[in-house]
Amino acid sequence: MASSATMLSSVATAACAAPAQASMVAPFVGLKSASAFPVTQKTATGLSTLPSNGGRVQCMKVWPIVGLKKFETLSYLPTLSVESLLKQIEYLIRNGWVPCLEFSLEGFVSRDNNKSPGYYDGRYWTMWKLPMFGCTGAAQVVKEAAECKKEYPAAFIRVIGFDNVRQVQCVSFIVEKPE
């Protein structure tokens, strides 16, 4: 019993003699003063101080902000010629995507009916016939687009490349715009 009391008292004195943990590590005193760093200042001499890429860039307008709205893929290019359109559709078919034609009289997203997105805000277009499963040539798609244009002359018409395995739309571009 005496030995256990001696042991307890020796532990207590050891605990009191141990220094506080805060004094083992130096406390954070903040950042060094600014006077320790050398100061170099450039004098403003005009445009020569601005960053430059050697003057190779010329200013160009991206698109006119009035009267020419942009759509999806390829909308920043000029209107596709028939040859370019055929090449794009051949690319779509070559990748195994199913061509599908859609049309809309509105053509743009507008929130006239409600503040939240929905069916009637122009986001969803009407499908022209069924998706062209088994389509092997771009000429078939162009023929269907011309038929849709004949039926709805005031409509926007787009071609969609649909991947029926992953069930996603892979490409979409406008083929006809109203005049």
Curated annotation (Swiss-Prot):
GO molecular function: ribulose-bisphosphate carboxylase activity
Keyword Plastid in record: yes
Annotated localization: Plastid, Chloroplast
Function as written in the Swiss-Prot or TrEMBL entry: RuBisCO catalyzes two reactions: the carboxylation of D-ribulose 1,5-bisphosphate, the primary event in carbon dioxide fixation, as well as the oxidative fragmentation of the pentose substrate. Both reactions occur simultaneously and in competition at the same active site. Although the small subunit is not catalytic it is essential for maximal activity.
Main location: plastid
Keyword Plastid (UniProt): yes
InterPro entries: RuBisCO_ssu (IPR024681), RuBisCO_ssu_dom (IPR000894), RuBisCO_ssu_N (IPR024680), RuBisCO_ssu_sf (IPR036385)
Family of this protein: Belongs to the RuBisCO small chain family.
Domain of life of the source: Eukaryota
Keywords, comma-separated and alphabetical: Calvin cycle, Carbon dioxide fixation, Chloroplast, Photorespiration, Photosynthesis, Plastid, Transit peptide
Range annotated as the organelle transit peptide: 1-58
Protein name: Ribulose bisphosphate carboxylase small subunit, chloroplastic 5
Subunit structure: Heterohexadecamer of 8 large and 8 small subunits.
Entry GO terms, CC: chloroplast
Natural source organism: Fritillaria agrestis
One GO-annotated biological process of the protein: photorespiration
Gene that encodes it: RBCS5
SMART domains per the UniProt record, alphabetical: RuBisCO_small
Additional remarks: The basic functional RuBisCO is composed of a large chain homodimer in a 'head-to-tail' conformation. In form I RuBisCO this homodimer is arranged in a barrel-like tetramer with the small subunits forming a tetrameric 'cap' on each end of the 'barrel'.
